[in-house]
Swiss-Prot record:
Name of the featured protein: Capsid protein
SUPFAM superfamilies to which the protein is assigned, alphabetical: Positive stranded ssRNA viruses (SSF88633)
Compartments it resides in: Virion
Summary of subunit composition and partner proteins: Homomultimer.
Start and end residues of each stretch annotated as S domain, virion shell: 86-266
GO cellular component assignments: T=3 icosahedral viral capsid
Principal location: virion
Family: Belongs to the icosahedral plant coat protein family.
Free-text function comment from the UniProt entry: Capsid protein self-assembles to form an icosahedral capsid with a T=3 symmetry, about 28 nm in diameter, and consisting of 180 capsid proteins.
Length: 276
């Protein structure tokens, strides 16, 4: 029974029933949670008050205002190597390929298999090991077209090499974590290439490494991979980058570069002459 009781020191002790104590604990937990949420929102609210809204984030969409002019300067970083037990971990950022807007607004699509041999610098490292896995893999779009360039681009990962190529940008836009953007967007990505901070308003897609089919994939050369059937390619390739564009200008225009920022782990060294 709830009430008060006098202890040996002459102080009153409040007695509560178990039901009352549970209710009080729940109320205190709700108050603490609301306090944490309010505190977590303060930096965001303060930033918006000072700077206003920025270009939309890749992770949740937003808006882009075409700049009157723009340019990007990129510098390569020194690749970083580390070891964990018997494995070798490599961190680097490099150009994967570029995206072209087809002439007269025609639809255009590209498909890049994300095997360890896909990035040109990493390919020579992959030859030295039997197996690999992506610990982190992001594709960052850096524009290089005029800011008046028309068109739209969609970018997404697919997880089955047997999937048919999209025939319209709308099809690719329905893929898991797909992103749509104008070709002139993404200047902020230059600062993200060599940074460990959040992507901010960079145009980027992140590979969900927690949902891949296998824990490890065999390494293979690009030539050997290309000679396989699409079903066999799934044994070596965890995912593919698919990019689609339409609505471009009258003449074919290079829209931008696609950089790959990765952390990859290799195991089981092998002589490269044997690893085909």
């Amino acid at each position: 029974m709830a009430g008060k009781k006098n202890n040996n020191n002459g102080q009153y002790i409040i007695l509560r029933t178990p039901e009352q104590q549970v209710e009080i604990d729940q109320r205190n937990a709700r108050r603490a949670q609301m306090g944490r949420m309010k505190k977590a929102r303060q930096p965001v609210q303060r930033y918006l008050q000072q700077h206003g809204l920025r270009n939309g984030l890749s992770g949740r969409g937003g808006y882009i205002v075409a700049p009157t002019s723009g340019g990007v300067v990129t510098r390569p970083i020194v690749p970083k190597f580390s070891n964990r037990g018997d494995s070798t971990i490599v961190r680097n950022t490099e150009i994967l390929n570029n995206q072209i807007l087809a002439a007269l607004g025609a639809f255009n699509t590209t498909n890049s298999a994300l095997i360890a041999a896909a990035p040109s610098w990493l390919a020579s490292i992959a030859d030295l090991y039997s197996k690999y896995r992506w610990l982190s893999c992001e594709i960052i779009y850096i524009p290089k077209c005029p800011t008046t360039t028309s068109g739209s681009i969609a970018m997404a990962f697919t997880y089955d090499r047997n999937d048919a190529a999209p025939t319209a940008r709308a099809q690719l836009s329905q893929s898991y974590k797909a992103i749509n953007f104008p070709p002139y967007a993404g200047y902020d990505g230059a600062a993200y290439l060599n940074s460990n901070q959040g992507a901010g308003s960079a145009i980027a897609v992140q590979l969900d490494v927690t949902k891949l089919d296998k824990p490890w994939y065999p390494t293979i050369s690009s030539a050997g991979f290309g000679a396989l059937s699409v079903l066999d390619q799934n044994q070596f390739c965890p995912a593919s980058l698919v990019v689609a564009s339409d609505g471009g200008p009258a003449t074919a225009t290079p829209a931008g570069d696609l950089f790959i920022k990765y952390v990859i782990e290799f195991i089981e060294p092998i002589n490269p002459t044997m690893n085909v």
